[in-house]
A protein has these predicted regions:
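N-terminal leader/linker segments that initiate helical-solenoid repeat arrays
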Residues: 22-77, 81-82
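Terminal, low-structured helical/coil segments at or just beyond the last alpha-helical repeat
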Residues: 27-44, 217-261
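Structural marker of alpha-solenoid helical repeat scaffolds
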Residues: 48, 82, 116-117, 150-152, ...
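Canonical tetratricopeptide repeat
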Residues: 58, 92-95, 126, 160-162, ...
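Canonical positions in the second alpha-helix
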Residues: 78-79, 112-113, 146-149, 182-183, ...
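TPR alpha-solenoid repeat register
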Residues: 89, 123, 156-159, 193, ...
Length: 261
């Protein structure tokens, strides 16, 4: 299945839109510059705290995107003082922990966020994706199932794509195909689902179908080393040595530091 770095793109994307309950005028915090809110003297303290919390997480997510982990962590921890049990802050903190190599702390924060938000499909999907990255694909499926059952989950196809890829890792081929095809029915260009379907078809010896999915994957998003390697293997099995070599040449050109790994 797609390696963890590609799953993380899906996982991190879900963190950048922070849902805020109980404050309709500030329903989402988005990454990017933001103006300081103007408060009325009649604003209750709880509203000011909530808006401050939201702004801190937006700024932290922006810092995290550009790799400024120290600043991101400071802002998230300040936000957590305002709302210690807010799952969105815990997810961002988990992402920072993961990037810093603090794997145990990352897992604890992802799990705590999921337990605090059992009806938030995005939070549940995040924890499932993290478990799969850590080599626990069977356990991850439990959390993907919960995400898919969450009411009002707007990006369920992403959880289906993750679930399908992780089911493939767990050796559950029938479930993998079911979830991946469901994801592609909604998001035909989902790169996680396309690459996983290429891998599934390859494992089943369906090399023409694997080629079709690999080509769709490469057209849908920037190529990664793993998908180029898979495409090369598919072409080799189909007897097209020239095409196989072209993919290997792309690896050498586009991923020179990884070409020999």
């Amino acid at each position: 299945m797609p390696r963890p770095d590609r799953l993380w793109l899906v996982l991190f994307a879900g963190v950048l839109a922070v849902s805020v309950g109980g404050c309709k005028s500030h329903s989402k915090a988005k990454v990017g510059p933001s103006m300081a809110p103007v408060y009325s003297v009649r604003d209750p303290d709880s509203v000011r705290r909530q808006v401050r919390w939201q702004d801190l997480l937006a700024l932290a997510a922006r810092d995290m995107q550009v790799g400024n982990l120290d600043a991101a962590e400071r802002k998230v921890r300040e936000a957590q003082k305002l709302a210690p049990d807010a799952p969105d802050g815990l997810v961002l903190l988990a992402g920072i922990d993961e990037r810093r190599g603090r794997i145990q702390q990352a897992g604890e924060n992802f799990r705590r966020a999921a337990e605090l938000a059992p009806q938030r499909g995005d939070i549940l999907n995040n924890y499932g994706a993290w478990l799969c990255q850590q080599g626990q694909p069977a356990e991850s499926l439990i959390w993907f199932d919960r995400a898919l059952q969450a009411p009002g989950y707007a990006t369920a196809a992403e959880a289906q794509a993750n679930a399908g890829g992780c089911a493939l890792d767990a050796g559950q081929f029938e479930r993998a195909e079911r979830d991946l095809r469901a994801a592609l029915a909604t998001l035909p260009g989902n790169p996680v689902a396309l690459e996983a379907m290429a891998q599934l078809s390859f494992r089943r010896g369906q090399f023409l179908e694997a080629r079709a999915f690999a080509e769709r994957r490469i057209a849908a998003a920037p190529a990664t080393r793993s998908v180029l390697q898979l495409a090369s293997q598919i072409e080799a099995r189909l007897g097209d040595r020239a095409a196989s070599d072209r993919y290997l040449q792309r690896i050498r050109q586009e991923f020179p530091q990884e070409a020999g790994s």
